[in-house]
């Protein structure tokens, strides 16, 4: 089966969660990749954090999907600007970045 690089989608914390002003969760969805091993890092304003990443699951098209979550305090979220989900697959890093000011 040919190697396929993942598609990455990065979601900011929900407005509902931010309105509660206690925590902020970022979600990185990683879809349509093969083979299954992936590693995920989170980079916040240049510093690396580790999130919680699910084990890859096989999709109906025989490729894999996974997701990674980064939980922050609301004050942590509001004190940084650039949030990046960095996925390493098959020796290649793919990143998706969001800016808090644009959310």
Swiss-Prot record:
Recorded GO CC terms: extracellular region; IgG immunoglobulin complex
Keywords: Disulfide bond, Immunoglobulin domain
SMART domains found in the cross-reference section: IGc1 (SM00407)
Domain of life: Eukaryota
GO BP: immunoglobulin mediated immune response
Cited PROSITE patterns: IG_LIKE, IG_MHC
The protein, known as: Ig lambda chain C region
Annotated GO MF terms: antigen binding
Entries under PANTHER family matching the protein: IG-LIKE DOMAIN-CONTAINING PROTEIN, MHC CLASS II-RELATED
Disulfide bonds: 28-85
InterPro entries listed in its UniProt record: Ig-like_dom, Ig-like_dom_sf, Ig-like_fold, Ig/MHC_CS, Ig_C1-set, MHC/Immunoglobulin
Originating organism: Gallus gallus
Ig-like domain segment(s): 6-99
């Amino acid at each position: 089966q040919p190697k396929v690089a993942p598609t990455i989608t990065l979601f900011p914390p929900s407005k509902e969660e931010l309105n509660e002003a206690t925590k902020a969760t970022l979600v990185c969805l990683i879809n349509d990749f093969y083979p299954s091993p992936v590693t995920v890092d989170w980079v916040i304003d240049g510093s690396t954090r580790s999130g919680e990443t699910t084990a890859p699951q096989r999709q109906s098209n025989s490729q894999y999907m996974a997701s990674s979550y980064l939980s922050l305090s609301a004050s942590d979220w509001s004190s940084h600007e650039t949030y990046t989900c960095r996925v390493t697959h098959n020796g290649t890093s793919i990143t998706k970045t969001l800016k808090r000011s644009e959310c």
